Amino acid sequence: MECGDVQALVIDNGSSISKAGFAGDDAPRAVFPSIVGRQRYRDVMVGMGQKDSYVGDEAQSKRGILNLKYPIERGIITNWDDMEKIWHHTFYNELRVAPEEHPIHLTLSPSSSKANREKMTQIMFETFSNPAMYISIQSALSLYASGLTTGIVIDSGDGVSHTVPILEGHSINHAISRLDLAGNDLTDYLGKLLSGRGYPFISIDETEIVRDIKEKLSYITLDFQNEIKIVSSALEKSYELPDGKVISIGNELFRCPEALFQPSFLGMESAGIHETTYNSIMKCDVDIRKDLYDNVVLSGGTTMFPGIADRMNKELTALAPSTMKIKIIAPPERKYSVWIGGSMLSSLSTFQQMWISKEEYDESGPSIVHRKCF
């Protein structure tokens, strides 16, 4: 089967959010939570015609009566049965397609194991009977989305952050840095800061409120030490809760994302994202460092804070040699740039020979993925 004849599907499964759609589109058609919910009181519910499990938005809306599970933790698939449910839901409920009719382009975290890559390949061919598939490292796709093939990507979603140097489309594996600090950690931290202000947010519903406050009002300051000296009331912003009550929030709004640069705020000993970026560049060949400093690409929802690009520029300038030109690229659509890069790549005519076909899989088994994709 010629993959160019039928539209490929592009699926980017994140720790919290899955993005799915059709190759060649400029945005995903479906964006939904990467969750599977099961009844807490199974015997009663199933007898009343309730389903055994729910996925995505439906699971989210029924969370009061369900136990919710995230099959992807810190960017890595840890529960394959639930992951299959998410893929099934993606094909049949969200995109309404037959998976056996479309090539599938999937994405993976840079720190996923060889075994995970093989398992993903096996499920696509054996469970969903895909005619062809391909797996890309997420950060490389973000780079393509910015029209680049060489640069360093700072990719931070809800579960994990990575700094990934890429040369001519290939990630430089020994120089990748991983930081287990991302959006969910910042949401938890903001919740603690707000509790200290006398607004305790405890339940799952309230965690969603904290996430919303973070996404709508938080920002990164250029000079944290200076900003923290300003009287908090001068920085206050108001937020209306679902019940109509209005609360005021001050320096918590920039103290929360400051943890990206100072993980010690969360009790972590790791370097901040500026230092991990610098460390990744320093692990690369001296000849390509200039190209990396000149193409620092931000990717993922946790890089959406206002002020992040200026702060990153300031911090990297302080670390890098003084002769180095530093350019931070922060595309406005970077929340979805992994998916967008996958969509662009899958629709190129030159990409059509890259797919792993069902015939190749039947001949070589799951290990074909390492030869063709990585």
UniProtKB/Swiss-Prot annotation:
One of its GO terms (biological process) is phagocytosis. It is an enzyme of class 3 (hydrolase). Coiled coil: none annotated. Transmembrane segments: none annotated. The keyword Electron transport does not apply. One of its GO terms (molecular function) is structural constituent of cytoskeleton. It comes from the Eukaryota. It comes from Dictyostelium discoideum. This is Actin-17. It holds the Pfam family Actin. It is found in: Cytoplasm, Cytoskeleton. Actins are highly conserved proteins that are involved in various types of cell motility and are ubiquitously expressed in all eukaryotic cells. Multiple isoforms are involved in various cellular functions such as cytoskeleton structure, cell mobility, chromosome movement and muscle contraction. PROSITE patterns: ACTINS_1, ACTINS_2. Keywords: ATP-binding, Cytoplasm, Cytoskeleton, Hydrolase, Nucleotide-binding. Belongs to the actin family. InterPro entries: Actin, Actin_CS, ATPase_NBD. It catalyses: ATP + H2O = ADP + phosphate + H(+). Gene3D superfamilies: 3.30.420.40, Actin, Chain A, domain 4.
